[in-house]
């Protein structure tokens, strides 16, 4: 069958495989590409091609991740698979691979294991919104009752972490048998992809979200006003729009965008991904600074206190060589600026070691525009020592 041309018109969704080590995440990834390749929807990838993922660096952190792409009748997918547990933790916290949904792989022969639980918790904390379950290795379990028991266990575990355990699709299959071309098991991969297609919604595009632009630089043009430059993170901004200047200062200010410029050309509007200069009326050069954001009024608010799921770099990654304790005061780098914050460790935790993954409570010395899911780096004197994602805002 001739290869179908890559279709840009299909909606794009980012997904990934998660679950306990050796439950079959990589085998499933290989099976999906192999089964879809028969329809001309993917390039078949062997297990070894996926497993030998190259190391990447994201915010100074070394992560091994395999990226594959494929399509179904209705969508185009980018799929990430990580070889090691630590790679998942780092990946999900840095947002190196932003997932719109995940396929949780659980071995039917073993049932949920410690990392099954950890990956579900991480998904909840970093905001992976939807999970579909693939019960793998069902060819090794003859007892129908045992399969039902494992399914119930998985559903209970998902419910425990506030996912809709009763409604989540659970597909029972065998990635290895599908990879080997056995038709009955291949059909289960099709069933899985149908569940992913229908259960994981198409994400809202960045351009459709409310406008936000982190301010990188500010200067004034005599007779015209103040210009703030930066890359539009989401949404669109048009000439004449009212925007809010948020962060650092206690009070947010409303200003009007009187001009949008990109590559020295004037535009009517700018959208997510554009590097622009926004000409602002009614604001002095000294009233706006790097580290603030311009945003659609009311869409994001400044905060000082939050909880965050964090990963602390190892010495080998260029991080700290020693643990840190309660009241640790590093800088938190949000988008374009560092703000000092005071760290409170969870009750019963004496110290945090390099390489740990932990939920910290943070109090910043100045308010910053943040929301659940906002990513940041933890730095000491310009050197990255950790990465985190806001999981809960308290003030």
Curated annotation (Swiss-Prot):
Post-translational modification: Phosphorylated on serine and/or threonine residue(s), dephosphorylated by Stp.
Reaction it catalyzes: GTP + H2O = GDP + phosphate + H(+)
Enzyme class: hydrolase
Subcellular localization(s) per the UniProt record: Cytoplasm; Secreted, Cell wall
Gene Ontology CC terms: cytoplasm; extracellular region
Regulation: induction: Equally expressed in stationary and exponential phase (at protein level).
Keyword Secreted belongs to the record: yes
Region (G2): 60-64
Residue span(s) of domain tr-type G: 10-204
Region annotation G3: where it falls in the sequence: 81-84
Residues noted as binding Mg(2+) in the record, renumbered to the chain: 26
G5 as annotated region, ranges: 174-176
Role, per record: GTP hydrolase that promotes the GTP-dependent binding of aminoacyl-tRNA to the A-site of ribosomes during protein biosynthesis.
PANTHER family: ELONGATION FACTOR TU, MITOCHONDRIAL, ELONGATION FACTOR TU-RELATED
Protein name: Elongation factor Tu
The organism's taxonomic lineage, starting at the top: Bacteria, Bacillati, Bacillota, Bacilli, Bacillales
């Amino acid at each position: 069958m001739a290869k179908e041309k890559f279709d840009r018109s299909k909606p794009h969704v980012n997904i990934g495989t998660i679950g306990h080590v050796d439950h079959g995440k990589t085998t499933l990834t290989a099976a999906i590409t192999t089964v879809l390749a028969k329809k001309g929807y993917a390039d078949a990838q062997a297990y070894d091609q996926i497993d030998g993922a190259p190391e990447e660096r994201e915010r100074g952190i070394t992560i091994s991740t395999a990226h594959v792409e494929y399509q179904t009748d209705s969508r185009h997918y980018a799929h990430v698979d990580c070889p090691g547990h630590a790679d998942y933790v780092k990946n999900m916290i840095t947002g190196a691979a932003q997932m719109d949904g995940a396929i949780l792989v659980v071995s039917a022969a073993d049932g949920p294991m410690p990392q099954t639980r950890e990956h579900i918790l991480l998904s909840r904390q970093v905001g992976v919104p939807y999970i579909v379950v693939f019960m793998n290795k069902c060819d090794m379990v003859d007892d129908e009752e045992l399969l039902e028991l494992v399914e119930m266990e998985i559903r209970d575990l998902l419910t425990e972490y506030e996912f809709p355990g009763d409604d989540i699709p659970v597909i029972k299959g065998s990635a290895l048998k599908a990879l080997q071309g056995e038709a009955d098991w291949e059909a289960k991969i099709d069933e899985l992809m149908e569940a992913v297609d229908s259960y994981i919604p198409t994400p809202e595009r960045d351009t459709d979200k409310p406008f936000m632009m982190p301010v990188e630089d500010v200067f004034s043009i005599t007779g015209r006003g103040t210009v703030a430059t930066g890359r539009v993170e989401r949404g669109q901004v048009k000439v004449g729009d009212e925007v809010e200047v948020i962060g650092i200062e206690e009070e947010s200010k409303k200003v009007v965008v009187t001009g949008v410029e990109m590559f020295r050309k004037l535009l009517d509007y700018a959208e997510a991904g554009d590097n622009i200069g926004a000409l602002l009326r009614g604001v002095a050069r000294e009233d706006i600074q790097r580290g603030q954001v311009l945003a659609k009024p009311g869409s994001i608010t400044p905060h000082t206190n939050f909880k965050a799921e964090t990963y602390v770099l190892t010495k080998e990654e260029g991080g700290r060589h020693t643990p840190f304790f309660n009241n640790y005061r590093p800088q938190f780098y949000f988008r374009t600026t560092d703000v000092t914050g005071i760290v409170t460790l969870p009750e019963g935790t004496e110290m945090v070691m390099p390489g740990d993954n932990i939920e910290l409570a943070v109090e910043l010395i100045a308010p910053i525009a943040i929301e659940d899911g906002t990513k940041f780096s933890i730095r000491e004197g310009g050197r990255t020592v950790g990465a985190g994602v806001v999981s809960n805002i308290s003030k």
